[in-house]
Amino acid sequence: MGRCRVLVVGGTGYIGKRIVKASIEHGHDTYVLKRPETGLDIEKFQLLLSFKKQGAHLVEASFSDHESLVRAVKLVDVVICTVSGAHSRSLLLQLKLVEAIKEAGNVKRFIPSEFGMDPARMGDALEPGRETFDLKMVVRKAIEDANIPHTYISANCFGGYFVGNLSQLGPLTPPSDKVTIYGDGNVKVVYMDEDDVATYTIMTIEDDRTLNKTMYFRPPENVITHRQLVETWEKLSGNQLQKTELSSQDFLALMEGKDVAEQIVIGHLYHIYYEGCLTNFDIDADQDQVEASSLYPEVEYTRMKDYLMIYL
């Protein structure tokens, strides 16, 4: 593979910083968008400076300044956006990026901010969590209407949020004595190491096999059930947890009285652990769908038993 010019938008975020790192490690000429407000956040600014030390270029631009976005986009072949999906306003900022890419006319690949569940499959998702998927589809429509070459990334469950705490609501650390099992705990889920998400994402940018397609992440050994995840931790830690199965009705009842952010989390967990939305369909090449670990078998992805070791 050759050397690409890659612009990462949202490069100081949870997944964005890993994509910047992966891009640099793969030898690409890496640019990171520096928004004016970043200079007010010492941690983000220091992170940007660390990227610069590693050879990345910092490009000043603002979503409120169309011309600055166009200038930034004209510097590169590939644009990867990783702005947070936690706020609807952030997701729709990508429409400004789409307009800049359309005007610049030089981008060979755009990867918008998705990286979780495939929004195209979540049209019947529960409110208020459905809004995130709906807005991602608005961005997809804009991309496709503008005929922008793209790849959509469905990376499923990030380990930091779903694995270390055994997918429990609340703290991000493993429970010490009790664990709630969602349903019977036998629905298949896909868990990912965040660095592997970044690696697979960067590997797509010059690969014609992923052009204008959705790439799902299903490394075989990371497609496991909730119960298997819990048992993996028990084996590693030597600590048997008291397990309580929670029915779908009782789980959804947890939404009552919660704020919107908590309701969104509960709704998403319901789709993952009760409906099996990550694995209840086949990946279909005829529908412009591909699977990451099959395309890139050379990637030695992190298994969840190894991911959990840091929590011991």
Swiss-Prot record:
Gene Ontology MF, one: lariciresinol reductase activity
Keywords from the named record: NADP, Oxidoreductase
Gene3D superfamilies attached to this UniProt entry: NAD(P)-binding Rossmann-like Domain (3.40.50.720), UDP-galactose 4-epimerase, domain 1 (3.90.25.10)
Signal peptide start and end residues: none
Tissues/organs with expression: Expressed in seed coats, but not in embryos, leaves, stems and roots.
Residues holding substrate: 268
Residue positions of the active site: 136 (proton acceptor)
Domain of life: Eukaryota
Binding site for NADP(+): 10-16, 35, 44, 140
BP term (GO), one: lignan catabolic process
InterPro entries the record matches: NAD(P)-bd_dom_sf (IPR036291), NmrA-like (IPR008030), NmrA-type/Isoflavone_red_sf (IPR050608), PCBER-like (IPR045312)
Alphabetical list of SUPFAM superfamilies matching this protein: NAD(P)-binding Rossmann-fold domains
Functional description taken from the UniProt entry: Reductase involved in lignan biosynthesis. Catalyzes the sequential conversion of pinoresinol into lariciresinol and of lariciresinol into secoisolariciresinol. Abstracts the 4R-hydride from the NADPH cofactor during catalysis.
Assembly behavior: Dimer.
Protein name: Bifunctional pinoresinol-lariciresinol reductase
Organism: Linum usitatissimum
